[in-house]
Design a protein with these regions (language model features):
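Acidic, turn-prone loop/beta-hairpin segments
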Residues: 25-54, 79-154
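Catalytic adenosine-cofactor/nucleotide-binding cores of aminoacyl-tRNA synthetases and other
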Residues: 1-35, 122, 161-167
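Conserved short loop/turn motifs at secondary-structure junctions
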Residues: 1-2, 70-71, 87-91, 101, ...
Length: 197
């Protein structure tokens, strides 16, 4: 558990560093405007996390709350959303998500989260005095779209690993994949994604 906690704190540091590198310090007032399916998906996931952790804390279910936070940060945010944002970064969603994560994590890792918060280029106050995050509702249709992309990418990765393929091509007949071609190529690690003729 100690090693897991240490790795989790390192992950938080790395995520914060990546987002700070992405965000333009001259424009720290990026508005929260989700534009991609991934943006809507992560905000929906964040809303569920916020509600779930708040409920767990009220019931003193600290282990359950920590597990929710751990899997969200490690899987949903770092593995999926951060990787997706490397294609089309949304500074507003990245900043808002990071701030919300730090607020939610603060009861479990107060010193680490406060230190990260103070290192943010746009931070002007103390994390301990900030309010619990309020997550805006997101588009459920976009959430489902990204879930579909995730499922296809996961299956593609598994097939690539099982068959020992090097930089395979993904042939499909999906309008969704066609409109998210660059994203799919990045996430699935394929040479190209092309529509089936």
């Amino acid at each position: 558990r100690i090693e897991e906690a240490r790795n989790f704190c390192n992950k938080l540091w790395n995520v914060a560093r990546f987002i700070q590198d992405q965000v333009d310090i001259k424009n720290t007032e990026d508005s929260l405007q989700p534009t991609t399916a991934a943006d809507h998906w992560i905000l929906s996931k964040l809303q569920r996390l916020t509600d779930g952790v708040a409920s767990d804390l009220n019931m003193y279910a600290f282990a359950e709350a920590y597990d929710k936070i751990y899997h969200f940060v490690w899987d949903d945010f770092a593995d999926w959303y951060i990787e997706s944002s490397k294609t089309t970064p949304n500074h507003g969603v990245l900043k808002f998500s990071l701030e919300s994560i730090l607020k939610i994590c603060h009861p479990f890792a107060p010193f680490v989260t406060e230190t990260i918060w103070q290192s943010l280029k746009w931070s002007t106050d103390l994390l301990i005095t900030s309010s619990w995050p309020v997550i805006p509702k997101s588009d459920t249709s976009h959430y489902k779209q990204f879930e579909e992309i995730k499922a296809i990418v996961t299956e593609s990765r598994q097939l690539t690993k099982t068959m020992g393929l090097q930089k395979p091509s993904l042939v499909h007949s999906s309008d969704l994949l066609e409109s998210n071609q660059e994203l799919v190529q990045r996430l699935a690690k394929v040479a190209q994604s092309q529509e089936q003729g």
